[in-house]
UniProtKB/Swiss-Prot annotation:
Keyword Glycosyltransferase on entry: no
GO annotation, biological process: protein transport by the Tat complex
Transmembrane intervals: 1-21
UniProt xrefs under Pfam families: TatA_B_E
Gene: tatA
Protein name: Sec-independent protein translocase protein TatA
Taxonomic source organism: Dechloromonas aromatica (strain RCB)
Length: 76
């Protein structure tokens, strides 16, 4: 009683097709597939950019210390 059998799902599918029609369901499926594809492409682009950022050499700081005194700017 807790789970649905395949027959329950087939009846639900037939009712949904009768209500919305196959054309509407096909359009929804295409839109959903396009959204998933766009998300995957975006993730690939984000992962492709990440190694490029890591490959940039960092500036090596020598053993010299620079002592700087900061003065506050007053409003006139």
């Amino acid at each position: 009683m807790g789970s649905f059998s395949i027959w329950h799902w087939l009846i639900v599918l037939v009712i949904v097709m009768l209500i919305f029609g196959t054309k509407k369901l096909r359009n929804v499926g295409q839109d959903l597939g396009g959204a998933v594809k766009g998300f995957k492409d975006g993730m690939k682009e984000a992962n492709a950019d990440k190694p490029a950022e890591e490959a940039q050499p960092t500036q090596q700081v020598g053993g010299h210390t620079i002592d700087v005194e900061v003065k506050e700017k007053t409003k006139s």
